[in-house]
């Protein structure tokens, strides 16, 4: 029996690092003024945050075009591979629509999944797909399972500053000023494919406790499936502090915790100093 060759394609919004040979990452584009960069290709996460901290106007990100997807599909299908595409939420970017348009000529060969998520929440859905592939599941079985299980992913984060929400027009200057003076730390989550405010906490310690309670509400982390911790900015200091404060959540996990830097797609809107966690509920 010939083993089905399966390739996963995702976008750079997934913040995947060190991908396997069977994963293709297509970059979104980031524009700072007149300068455009391919996310993770011509600009690293570190370089992105160095520029973000210096600029007064927020950069913009643009979708992966249908042509780029089509080229990737053609290459994979020509090599005898079945393709599973997992994209950032269609409510946050037109990338999923691009992937679907390009897939119209590849019926039965290319399957597109809207992760209804972003950053490390999207990443762990890809990683779960790889886990299922390694268990010998077919492409159709993997797609069916991922479509069913993607709603069980929780992605949430604690922001260090309101400055970037203000720059992006999501809150007023007055709210940002008062919030800064009171050391207000917003807690956000991805819900039904959109980023929502879960609540606010005063100070980092209360923010960490808020995040811990939200994870406990979801019955904790399912360590049998992929999960990931992430941070924005040039240092993981605040993430390490959060891990220390929430050590009871991770005590059943014997290996090194999976940690990722969060790139431009989320970093643009939340700024440096945010910490995030994505996991499957039990």
Q: Which residue ranges define each predicted feature?
A:
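Mixed-charge interfacial surface used for oligomerization/domain docking
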Residues: 2-6, 13-35, 95-111, 117-127, ...
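Conserved beta-strand elements of the Class I
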Residues: 7-9, 84
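Class I S-adenosyl-L-methionine
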Residues: 36-105
């Amino acid at each position: 029996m010939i083993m089905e060759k399966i390739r996963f394609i995702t976008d750079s919004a997934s913040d995947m690092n060190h991908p396997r040979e069977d994963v293709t990452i297509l970059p979104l584009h980031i524009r700072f003024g007149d300068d455009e960069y391919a996310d993770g290709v011509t600009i690293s996460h570190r370089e992105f945050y160095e520029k973000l901290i210096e600029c007064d106007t927020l950069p913009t990100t643009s979708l992966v075009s249908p042509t780029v997807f089509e080229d990737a599909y053609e290459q994979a299908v020509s090599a005898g591979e079945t393709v599973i595409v997992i994209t950032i939420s269609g409510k946050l970017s037109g990338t999923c629509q691009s992937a679907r348009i390009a897939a119209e000529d590849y019926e039965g060969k290319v399957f597109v999944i809207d992760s209804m998520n972003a950053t490390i929440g999207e990443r762990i859905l890809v990683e779960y797909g790889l886990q299922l592939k390694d268990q010998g599941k077919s492409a159709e079985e993997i797609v069916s399972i991922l479509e069913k299980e993607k709603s069980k992913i929780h992605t949430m984060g604690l922001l260090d500053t309101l400055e970037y929400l203000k720059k992006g027009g999501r809150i007023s200057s007055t709210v940002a000023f008062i919030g800064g003076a009171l050391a207000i730390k917003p807690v956000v989550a991805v819900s039904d494919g959109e980023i929502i405010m879960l609540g606010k906490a005063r100070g980092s310690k209360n923010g960490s406790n808020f995040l811990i309670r939200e994870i406990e509400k979801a019955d904790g982390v399912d360590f049998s499936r992929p999960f990931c911790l992430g941070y924005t900015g040039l240092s993981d200091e605040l993430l390490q502090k959060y891990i220390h404060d929430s050590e009871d959540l991770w005590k059943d996990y014997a290996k090194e915790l999976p940690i990722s830097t969060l790139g431009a797609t989320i970093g643009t809107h939340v700024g440096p100093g945010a910490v995030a966690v994505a996991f499957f509920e039990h």
